[in-house]
């Protein structure tokens, strides 16, 4: 069988368009990424500072409740009754366990939890 050269079709590989960004485009994109990272860091540090202040305030409130409703502060039947009827007391045991942590450790753990919650909200 002879090959007929006149009927042969040359099939060239498909051309893939290439995008060559200019140096300015690459540089501006990298700057934009850096700015976004800096803004994110600022936001996270601000959130952690605000949350640390919230934790400090909450712990001081819990300490006031513990002091106010402790058996040492009251005597007799009133002390036992006030411990069982105060609405904050179910939280006291839980907060006492958390209060054992250092404030910085607590703030760091809560910051990680906040970051996880932000990521989870963005995905849903």
Swiss-Prot record:
Miscellaneous comment: Almost completely overlaps OPY2.
The protein's name: Putative uncharacterized protein YPR076W
Species the sequence originates in: Saccharomyces cerevisiae (strain ATCC 204508 / S288c)
